[in-house]
Amino acid sequence: MSRTIFCTFLQRDAEGQDFQLYPGELGKRIYNEISKEAWAQWQKKQTMLINEKKLNMMNPEHRKLLEEEMVNFLFEGKEVHIEGYTPPEQQ
């Protein structure tokens, strides 16, 4: 059975995660406050960031950068800036 949460990213009730996807306190916050839909949006941005900036997830500095971008996107409402990318709605 799915859980319904108030998603702080979408600002509405939505289906919550099935399990904690990220470790630690931040992971608990994501589990309790971020819906599946919002997480899917983040995953698309994350993939673009990793590819465009050529991030290596074995590098602790790259992981830290990605985590900062994730917090900014999911909790602070900041858009992820990817050089050279223009969203379709702005073209």
From Swiss-Prot:
GO cellular component: cytosol
Keywords: Iron
Transmembrane segments: none
Any one GO MF annotation of this record: iron ion binding
InterPro entries: Fe_traffick_prot_YggX, Fe_traffick_prot_YggX_sf
Pfam family, one: Iron_traffic
Record keyword Iron present: yes
Highest taxon of source: Bacteria
GO biological process terms, semicolon-separated: cellular response to oxidative stress
Isomerase found in the keyword field: no
Function statement: Could be a mediator in iron transactions between iron acquisition and iron-requiring processes, such as synthesis and/or repair of Fe-S clusters in biosynthetic enzymes.
Self-association and partners: Monomer.
HAMAP family with a match to the protein in the record: Fe_traffic_YggX (MF_00686)
Similarity comment: Belongs to the Fe(2+)-trafficking protein family.
Protein name per the record: Probable Fe(2+)-trafficking protein
Taxonomy of the source species: Bacteria, Pseudomonadati, Pseudomonadota, Gammaproteobacteria, Enterobacterales
